[in-house]
């Protein structure tokens, strides 16, 4: 997990995560900070193990840490900004070209339904990470009732 720690300590990662924190200050709905990124990583890794997908742990964690980073640049349409930021950060953290391509491909489509492989588990983990069952703002949430996580799954 040395490369994951390099991402976490990368100056650009820190700078953008601070921006996201400022943008979300006072937000009553789900946040997109490090806690969310780590929740997504852990859930995605559990899914990976349960479904015997054999996706490398560091690839899952790197994708999870970077998937929402673009919110610090363009909050609403963040996926492509996340890709651009990941392209700057990953080489500095010893990810090779093939790994970087795999990660940025997953980030670019992580919000789409019915993905498979890495992007699929990131998308599922992203949704499953939401603690709707414990949210004080659930009554005004924009999510449809059938999308809410009303039970603990992971």
Residue map of PLM features:
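Metal-dependent phosphohydrolase cores
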Residues: 1-154
